[in-house]
């Protein structure tokens, strides 16, 4: 019987440095000899999910209700789980996702003010008890994150256009999630320089690697 793969999620606000984090993980898995890890993202990961992602990020839908937003995210997630994440893990491959359900608790539950209860109902329905093996939370001051986004110079999507109160609420929701599940979460100070963040990332996943592949 094929051993199930490992599922790692990377969470954080806009400008937290998730790209740097994912690159560090990719290099680490390569060095450890992990075969064909799959890197994916949320919302997205499937043609259906990517179409919904485009709508969610489009500034023309700025007035979308919080409820519609949460339901759209979970519609994309249901397809992502069924078509990509679960089959890949069952085949013994590792899956690394740029955001997952903790982001919904943060952005819709916290930032939009829906609270945890309604998100939890959707999670139970869509997940059926499924949860990541490890979540790396890149904790960044919203002011720092927004400054990084502004320096990219590629325009702001619908969420990047939000202001500090939204991101402060999302950050607080992330912190509550991490405090409630310390075994799964590894919190990383993403305000630090890129090299230091990469080192924290490597330390955050090292124990998941096969013994011979650990640094």
Swiss-Prot record:
Gene3D superfamilies associated with the record: P-loop containing nucleotide triphosphate hydrolases (3.40.50.300)
InterPro entries registered for this protein in UniProt: P-loop_NTPase, Thymidylate_kin-like_dom, Thymidylate_kinase
Enzyme class: transferase
Key word Nucleotide-binding present: yes
Enzymatic reactions: dTMP + ATP = dTDP + ADP
EC id: 2.7.4.9
Superkingdom of this protein's organism: Bacteria
Gene Ontology MF annotations: ATP binding; dTMP kinase activity
GO biological process, one term: dTTP biosynthetic process
Protein family membership: Belongs to the thymidylate kinase family.
UniProt cross-references to PANTHER family, sorted A to Z: THYMIDYLATE KINASE, UMP-CMP KINASE 2, MITOCHONDRIAL
Function: Phosphorylation of dTMP to form dTDP in both de novo and salvage pathways of dTTP synthesis.
Protein name (Swiss-Prot/TrEMBL): Thymidylate kinase
Organism: Halorhodospira halophila (strain DSM 244 / SL1) (Ectothiorhodospira halophila (strain DSM 244 / SL1))
Gene from which the chain derives: tmk
């Amino acid at each position: 019987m094929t051993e199930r793969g490992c599922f790692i999620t990377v969470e954080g606000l806009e400008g937290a440095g998730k790209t740097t984090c994912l690159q560090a993980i990719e290099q680490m898995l390569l060095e450890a000899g992990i075969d064909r890890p799959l890197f994916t993202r949320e919302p997205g990961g499937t043609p259906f999910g990517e179409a919904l992602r485009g709508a969610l990020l489009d500034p023309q839908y700025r007035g979308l209700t919080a409820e519609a937003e949460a339901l759209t995210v979970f519609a994309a997630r249901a397809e992502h789980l069924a078509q990509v994440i679960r089959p890949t893990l069952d085949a013994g491959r590792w899956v690394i996702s740029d955001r997952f359900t903790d982001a919904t608790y943060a952005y819709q539950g916290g930032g939009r003010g829906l609270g945890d209860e309604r998100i939890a109902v959707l999670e139970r329905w869509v997940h059926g008890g499924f949860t990541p093996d490890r979540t790396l939370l890149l904790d960044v001051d919203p002011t720092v994150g927004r400054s990084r986004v502004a320096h990219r110079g590629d325009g702001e999507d619908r969420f990047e256009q939000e202001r500090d109160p939204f991101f402060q609420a999302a950050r607080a929701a992330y912190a509550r999630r991490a405090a409630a599940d310390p075994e799964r979460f590894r919190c990383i100070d993403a305000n630090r320089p890129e090299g230091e963040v990469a080192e924290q990332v490597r330390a955050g996943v090292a124990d998941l690697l096969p013994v011979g592949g650990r640094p």
